[in-house]
Amino acid sequence: MDNNSQNIDKLKQEFIANASHELKTPVTSIQLAVETAITALENSELEDTRKFLNQILIDSQRMTLLLSDLLDLSQLEVNDPIKELVNLKNIVEAEIRFLPEENKNRVNFESVDIDFLIDPDDFSMIVRNLLRNACNYSEKNKKIDVNLFFDNSDVVLTILDRGRGISKADQERIFERFYRVDKGRSRALGGTGIGLSIVKHAVERNNGNIQVKSNLGEGSEFIVKFFNT
């Protein structure tokens, strides 16, 4: 087996381990929280019950994000894109509305109405993962700028965060499946290391490309371009 194959196998093993851990941890936490909440209800400890129910909600959200990544990846690998003429501005606005309230208020979105031939599920997937990435890797009080515009007949989507930035070495690998820039932080956020590879796959199969511009300490800008050919 060559080095490249060994590296891929190692990354796959890491992903399986990470995914298993991320699924097992919230399930265990949910079970414990439910048991404790039941006991607290029996003892009329309402404040404790509120805290445990909140933990159930958080862990359920983590599981949902992980399963969403796995389902997105499966969809991209199994199904061919089904392109439709859709309004891209409406799709971006919908994905912003789906964000948690504290993140929704951080996003500045500017766009004209753009009708474009693309797989709408793929485009939603792209926007959703890039928004999640920007929210996760920037401070909670920092704004995120999202722009959607025409470049002649092509379409460009940019998402700019003001986070910690990405090193030049990591920029060369961030779109690789299973690769994580900061494994410790990704685990704390419930990440699996496949979000940006999902984005790249979805972009390229819709006749587009993606690049990142970033300096450490200065945030990151992801630039997606779809070609009208």
Summary of predicted features, one role per range:
Residues 58-63:
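Short alpha-helical segment of the dimerization/phosphotransfer core of two-component systems
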Residues 77-82, 115-118:
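Conserved micro-motifs of the catalytic ATP-binding
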Residues 82-97, 149:
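A conserved beta-strand-to-alpha-helix junction within the catalytic ATP-binding
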Residues 134-135:
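Short helix-loop "hinge" at the ATP-lid/N-box region of the Bergerat-fold HATPase_c
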Residues 141-153:
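Short beta-strand/loop element within the Bergerat-fold HATPase_c
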Residues 166-178:
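Short conserved segment of the HATPase_c
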Residues 207-208:
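Conserved glycine-rich
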